[in-house]
């Protein structure tokens, strides 16, 4: 939850990170959203739900925790609706029909016309699409950006581990560290802006 808050605060301080390219046009978002996938159960073939959380500028760590826990609980316990319900319907379609429906959705995406019920809970349309690989005991990776939606930042959070570090006074100490892999759409800002943001 600390990482989610840190990512959101960084984007508030570096607003160009909250932009995206769609249909060969540049857009600036009005709000910061963080999206991820929540498994219903930690099992190989468990269903997944898509979750998007709005990040107000003044939120606290307690609010982050309540919002994340609440959204994940809802995603795991309630019947799928919105984009999750649409995905349940789409996966039952014959392949030719599915291919046609996907073509329509991708065309709507190009023109920025994807319906709200498909967009609002889809992490592909969030400011940042996060994956917490540490929750399944995996290290961080550099995840590709998707060719659908408007998410310009992918963040993969790894496992928390112990690492020996040298403190400011020269002494050695063992601290908890976590690696995070960020993949960024280089069209929204230059390397200098990204480097200063990270």
Residue ranges and their predicted role:
Residues 1-198:
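C-terminal catalytic/motor cores of large multi-domain enzyme assemblies
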């Amino acid at each position: 939850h600390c990482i989610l808050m840190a990512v959101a605060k960084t984007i508030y301080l570096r607003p160009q990170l909250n932009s995206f390219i769609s249909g060969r046009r540049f857009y600036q978002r009005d709000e910061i959203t963080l999206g991820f996938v929540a498994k219903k159960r930690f099992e190989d073939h468990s269903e997944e739900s898509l979750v998007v959380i709005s990040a107000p500028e003044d939120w606290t760590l307690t609010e982050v925790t309540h919002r994340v826990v609440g959204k994940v609980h809802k995603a795991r316990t309630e019947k799928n609706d919105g984009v999750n319900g649409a995905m349940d319907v789409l996966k039952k379609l014959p392949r030719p029909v599915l291919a046609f429906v996907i073509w329509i959705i991708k065309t709507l995406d190009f023109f920025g016309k994807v319906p709200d019920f498909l967009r609002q809970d889809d992490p592909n349309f969030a400011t940042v699409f996060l994956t917490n690989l540490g929750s399944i005991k995996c290290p961080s990776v550099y995840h590709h950006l998707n060719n659908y939606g408007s998410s310009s930042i992918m963040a993969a959070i790894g496992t928390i581990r112990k690492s020996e570090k040298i403190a400011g006074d020269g002494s050695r100490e063992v601290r908890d560290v976590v690696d995070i892999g960020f993949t960024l759409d280089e069209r929204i800002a230059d390397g200098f802006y990204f480097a200063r943001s990270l």
